Amino acid sequence: MRLWATMMMAVSIGIVAGAQKDGSGGVHVDPAKVAAALAKGGPLVTRSDLLVQGSHREAAGQVEVHDKETDVLYVVDGEATFVFGGKMVGGKVSRPEQWLGTDITGGETHHIGKGDVFVIPAGVPHWFKEVPKSVSYFVVKVLKQ
């Protein structure tokens, strides 16, 4: 299962970031830009139907719920405790169609590391609850129109 998910993520990134600019709508992202995004966090591809970004965390985050974004996460380095599902505690709107909260009750807790892939559908609470040192990962946000 993990191999299949990793392969699907690689195919998704290849379609978005590996194609040459030839009028087909494909986009190539230079390896230096990818490395910079994974080191500090930052966007790689921005389109009306999806976003691809590199992310880097050195501390826990807040609980997030996106009304119209499915997140696909692929961990490339580090480790963390990641929780998803259940119900958000203390949710407040942070921007249109996104909520931030303080905790999750009844969610699934996973110790994650290099090679892990998660698909978080729109409407599902999720967060990096603990980050002992750091974690770097790609996020593909598939946007509902």
Name these PLM-found stretches.
Residues 111-131:
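Conserved metal-binding segment of the jelly-roll/cupin
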Residues 67-88, 94-105:
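Short, conserved beta-strand element in jelly-roll/cupin
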Residues 133-145:
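A short hydrophobic beta-strand segment most commonly corresponding to one strand
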Residues 88-90, 134-135:
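Short, surface-exposed beta-strand-loop junctions and turns on beta-sheet-rich folds
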Residues 54, 82-84, 137:
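Short hydrophobic/aromatic-rich beta-strand segments that constitute the beta-sheet cores
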Residues 4-5, 13-68:
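A short, N-terminal "cap"/entry segment at the start of jelly-roll beta-barrel domains
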Residues 65-67, 103, 110-112, 120-121:
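Short solvent-exposed loop/turn micro-motifs enriched in small/polar/acidic residues
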